[in-house]
């Protein structure tokens, strides 16, 4: 409940209550309120439930109407009540501020009739002295002019601006629109947009005083919207909605808190009473509030009503009539003209009886609404036409004879055709008055077509680059790997010559002159140069990746070993070498090693034959911005260079040489082992002794054909084995055969012993059983 009963601050005779200050003192007692108070007013049509809303929301006790007895004026003049209790969804423990609530006499009441002077002044007073003005309206009133008090608000805005608009402070008033009986069919956002548009339109039409010509509605007011359910039919939801509304009056620090500092008048409470009385005196004496005349108001209301009815009928017929014709220009334009003329004719028949200036003003507004509605269909038709024409263009470009028609020619012809047909359709709408201005549509169309052509050009370029890349990359890789796997001292000269020739061969079809290319898709010289540069970047990156991926430590060691063995194992004619002495091996070793190491430095650093480091003529990566990025450290703590020419670090070079030395040393040792048998000299007297002692056997062998044959076979076998140094494999075979024979013999002996042991055990078991039987 309120702290005190409400008092009539301004009575129905427009007199300000002189005991207001005493009332405030009674409400606050001995407390020093200072600036910690707030003023709220409610404004709206008579019998719309304003007092009821205040009583439920702020626990006040304003008089309310008993609808079961009679609908009549309850609040007369302006009443004031004090409260600290706001109905909220949660309990607030902190000290609540003092709130003073003004219940303003309802507008459009039958008791005052056409005398609207008091309701205008009361509304203006409420705006002038309040922080928050609650505008109470029913959902069905939105869109009306009188029913939702828009005409009154316009007058109040105008006079408020003339009286208080020149103040230099930043004071504002919050207009809180409380939409009653909101059932939710129409979203609150849609309703708020409608009211906001009406308010903004009213503000632009105001007669502003000097110095305020450029002012905006939002320089003086903030707008908020809240929907409340039906109090009788949805009582629980209504109560919950009111509590949610109450949260915004007490929840400080939240985004939806209504009592913002810029709304407060920054006056002590006793100063506010003086300020309020002075405002009422100024409003009461101002004669400009007696505007406009009832005739003009009626004309505006009725013409707006007729306009809305005509527009609603137009919209109701529109979709059904237009939908089947959207693809046919002739039928569509005829139907649009027919619907528009029917709508304007209906408006003219009824609205032309009112004041001509108001009638023409509303007719122009109706015509604008019709054109706005029709423009959506026109835009939809033109967009559909654009899509169709664009599909035709893409088909023409893709199916063109590439041998006779270039991409540029095909696109240019298609673009000209599209523009011609599009402009013809747009002119048809314009001539019939269905399209007021075509500048925006033309600009949008031009931008759209340019963007689509750019996309088509990009796709064509991407396809060309893809074809170039498909051939260029594998060719470069194959050629480079082949040259590096069989390197010479001039391998980098060969690689760079092959690199340039491969690029040139793949893009020769687009070359117009030296270092100038035209990729034949309608690009400028600089754009073509950029594409050429990108191709070179692709080629350089491929070369860089191929070289550094291939020339790893193991690969370089393998290349050096192959070069060593080519000279060490084979002579100049390519025949295998047969070693006789160690000196011969050592000499060949030195020559082969020198031959292998000739290319070691070449494979470590990419330089030309004249000792110039190979440096790419294009940036290799986006992050290349200076020398700071040329050196990096790997996971093992080794520093590397990002520069293309630097292949091996000093540490890696030492690693390569160590592995290479170990491998070639093993090769040399194997070769020396092969001639060990030739170093063993048999004494000559052994041959004489063999001849003397074995003469008889020799004669016996010669005389026996079998022995001769075996001797020849064994001799040939011995010669082949000795000639090709196969004693090692023969020894291995013999050892393997002997081992297998030994294993077989052991298995047989083991089997024999086991079987013999089993037989003995069998006999012993029989003898043991016989002895047992005898003992028994």
UniProtKB/Swiss-Prot annotation:
Topology relative to the membrane: Multi-pass membrane protein
A GO term for molecular function: GTPase activity
Cellular localization per UniProt: Endoplasmic reticulum membrane
Keywords: Endoplasmic reticulum, GTP-binding, Hydrolase, Membrane, Nucleotide-binding, Transmembrane, Transmembrane helix
Gene name linked to the record: SEY1
Function, as annotated: Cooperates with the reticulon proteins RTN1 and RTN2 and the tubule-shaping DP1 family protein YOP1 to generate and maintain the structure of the tubular endoplasmic reticulum network. Has GTPase activity, which is required for its function in ER organization.
InterPro entries per the UniProt record, alphabetical: G_GB1_RHD3_dom, P-loop_NTPase, RHD3/Sey1, Sey1/RHD3-like_3HB
Gene Ontology cellular component terms for the protein in this record: endoplasmic reticulum membrane
Record CDD domains: GBP
HAMAP family: Sey1
Residue spans crossing the bilayer: 682-702, 706-726
Ranges for domain GB1/RHD3-type G: 34-263
SUBUNIT field: Interacts with RTN1 and YOP1; GTP binding is not required for these interactions.
PROSITE patterns: G_GB1_RHD3 (PS51715)
EC number, as in UniProt: 3.6.5.-
Primary site of residence: endoplasmic reticulum
Sequence positions that bind GTP: 44-51
Cytoplasmic side: 1-681, 727-776
Recorded coiled-coil stretches: none
Signal peptide annotation: none
Lumenal-facing ranges: 703-705
Name the UniProt record assigns to this protein: Protein SEY1
First-level EC class: hydrolase
Family of this protein: Belongs to the TRAFAC class dynamin-like GTPase superfamily. GB1/RHD3 GTPase family. RHD3 subfamily.
A Gene Ontology biological process term: endoplasmic reticulum membrane fusion
């Amino acid at each position: 409940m309120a702290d005190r009963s409400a008092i009539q601050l301004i009575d129905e005779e427009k007199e300000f209550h002189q005991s207001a200050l005493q009332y405030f003192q009674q409400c606050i007692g001995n407390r020093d309120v200072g600036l910690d108070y707030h003023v709220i007013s409610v404004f709206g049509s008579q019998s719309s439930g304003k007092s009821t809303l205040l009583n439920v929301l702020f626990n006040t006790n304003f008089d309310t109407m008993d609808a079961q007895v009679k609908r009549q004026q309850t609040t007369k003049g302006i009443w004031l009540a004090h409260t600290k209790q706001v109905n909220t969804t949660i309990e607030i423990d902190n000290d609540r501020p003092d709130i003073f609530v003004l219940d303003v006499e309802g507008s459009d009441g039958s008791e005052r009739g056409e005398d609207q002077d008091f309701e205008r002044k009361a509304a203006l007073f409420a705006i002038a002295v309040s922080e928050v003005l609650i505008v109470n309206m029913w959902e069905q009133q939105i869109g009306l002019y009188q029913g939702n008090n828009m005409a009154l608000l316009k007058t109040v805005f105008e006079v408020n601006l003339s009286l208080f608009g020149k103040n230099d402070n930043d004071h504002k008033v919050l207009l809180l629109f409380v939409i009653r009986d909101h059932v939710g069919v129409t979203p609150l956002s849609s309703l708020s947009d409608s009211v906001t548009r009406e308010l903004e339109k009213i503000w632009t039409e105001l007669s502003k005083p000097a110095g305020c010509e450029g002012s905006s509605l939002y320089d003086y007011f903030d707008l908020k919207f809240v929907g409340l359910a039906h109090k009788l039919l949805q009582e629980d939801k209504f109560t919950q909605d009111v509590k949610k509304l109450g949260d915004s009056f007490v929840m400080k620090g939240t985004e939806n808190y209504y009592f913002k500092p810029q709304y407060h008048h920054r006056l002590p409470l006793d100063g506010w009473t003086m300020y309020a009385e002075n405002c009422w005196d100024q409003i009461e004496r101002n004669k400009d509030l007696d505007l406009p005349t009832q005739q003009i108001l009626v004309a505006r209301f009725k013409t707006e009503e007729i306009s809305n009815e005509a527009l609603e009928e137009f919209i109701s017929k529109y979709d059904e009539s237009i939908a089947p014709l959207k693809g046919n220009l002739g039928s569509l334009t005829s139907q649009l003209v027919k619907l528009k003329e029917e709508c304007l004719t209906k408006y003219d028949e009824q609205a032309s009886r009112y004041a001509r200036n108001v009638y023409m003003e509303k007719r122009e507004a109706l015509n604008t609404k019709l054109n706005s509605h029709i423009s959506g269909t026109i835009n939809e038709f033109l967009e559909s036409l654009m899509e169709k024409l664009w599909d035709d263009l893409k088909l023409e470009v893709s199916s063109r004879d590439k041998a006779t028609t270039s991409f540029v020619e095909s696109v240019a012809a298609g673009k000209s055709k599209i523009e011609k047909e599009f402009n013809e359709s747009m002119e048809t709408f314009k001539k019939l008055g269905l399209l007021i201005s075509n500048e925006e549509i033309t600009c949008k169309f031009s931008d759209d077509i340019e963007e689509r052509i750019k996309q088509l050009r990009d796709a064509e370029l991407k396809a060309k680059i893809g074809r170039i890349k498909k051939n260029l990359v594998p060719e470069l890789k194959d050629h480079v790997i082949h040259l590096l796997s069989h390197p010479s001292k001039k391998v980098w000269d060969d690689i760079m010559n092959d690199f340039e020739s491969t690029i040139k061969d793949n893009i020769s079809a687009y070359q117009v002159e030296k270092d100038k290319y035209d990729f034949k898709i309608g690009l400028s010289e600089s754009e073509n140069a950029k594409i050429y540069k990108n191709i070179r970047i692709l080629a350089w990156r491929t070369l860089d990746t191929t070289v550094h991926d291939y020339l790893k430590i193991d690969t370089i060691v393998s290349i050096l070993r192959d070069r060593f063995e080519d000279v060490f194992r084979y002579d100049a004619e390519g025949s295998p070498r047969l070693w006789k002495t160690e000196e011969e091996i050592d000499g060949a070793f030195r020559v082969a090693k020198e031959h292998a190491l000739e290319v070691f430095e070449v494979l470590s650093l990419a330089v030309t034959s004249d000792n110039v480091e190979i440096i790419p003529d294009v940036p290799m990566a986006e992050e290349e911005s200076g020398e700071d990025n040329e050196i990096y450290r790997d996971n093992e703590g080794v520093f590397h260079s990002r520069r293309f020419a630097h292949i091996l670090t000093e540490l890696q070079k030492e690693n390569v040489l160590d592995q290479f030395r170990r491998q070639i040393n093993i090769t040399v040792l194997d070769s020396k082992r092969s001639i060990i048998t030739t170093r063993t000299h048999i004494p000559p007297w052994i041959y004489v002794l063999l001849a003397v002692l074995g003469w008889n056997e020799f004669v016996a062998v010669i005389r026996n054909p079998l022995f001769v044959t075996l001797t020849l076979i064994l001799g040939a076998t011995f010669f082949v084995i000795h000639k090709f140094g196969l004693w090692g494999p023969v020894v291995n075979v013999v050892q393997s055969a002997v081992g297998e024979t030994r294993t077989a013999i052991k298995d047989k002996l083991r089997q024999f012993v086991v079987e013999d042991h089993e037989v003995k055990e069998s006999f012993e078991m029989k003898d043991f059983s016989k002895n047992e039987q005898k003992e028994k």
